[in-house]
Amino acid sequence: KNCFLFRKSFMKKIAIIGAGISGLFAANLFSKNSDYQVMIYEKNNSIELDEGYGIQLSTNSIKLLNNIGFNKLEDIDQFNPEQIDFYDLKNQKKICELNISKFNTENCKYTALKRSKLVKFLKNRLDNQVIKYGHNIQKIEKKDDQVVLSFKENSEKVVCDILIISDGI
């Protein structure tokens, strides 16, 4: 006897508005699963990768980032401070200190790094076709079980099953 098992599978289309850190992170998470097709719509014509300023990442955020390979980032690109000192801005006197190393584990350490390093890491893990630049959202409509996106720049309409808005506003 022949027996065939057919899995009825529908790839869910995910649209992400905004190619900042949160949008890029979400795209990385969903891209790991073949049940999802991910597309990021960014209003700017590129992602700013200037050296810029530093950011601090808690151990909880490092744990999430490690799910997409952050732990493979070179040590030279990051710093793991042991404590944070708090100062009064008016008189510049130290108010207190926080020993953050006690929150660290072997694989999840409080981390400081340049924002551009994190953005490059997140962007470089995605296929080039995942980010559509120059797409400024004009209208979002719900139609049955889907979402329809319209853009200011053209008459293109995008239909998706899941919409993630992470435009920083």
Where are the language model's segments positioned?
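Short beta-strand/turn micro-motifs composed of small residues
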Residues: G18, E42, I165
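Short, Lys/Arg-enriched N-terminal segments with co-localized hydrophobic residues
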Residues: K1-F10
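Conserved SAM/SAH-binding loop-helix junction
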Residues: F25
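Conserved N-terminal helical subregion
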Residues: I14, S31, S58-I169
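Glycine-rich FAD pyrophosphate-binding loop
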Residues: S31-E51
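Active-site loop of classical SDR/Rossmann-like NAD(P)-dependent oxidoreductases
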Residues: Y53-L57
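Beta1/beta-strand and adjacent pyrophosphate-binding region of the FAD-binding site
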Residues: M11-S22
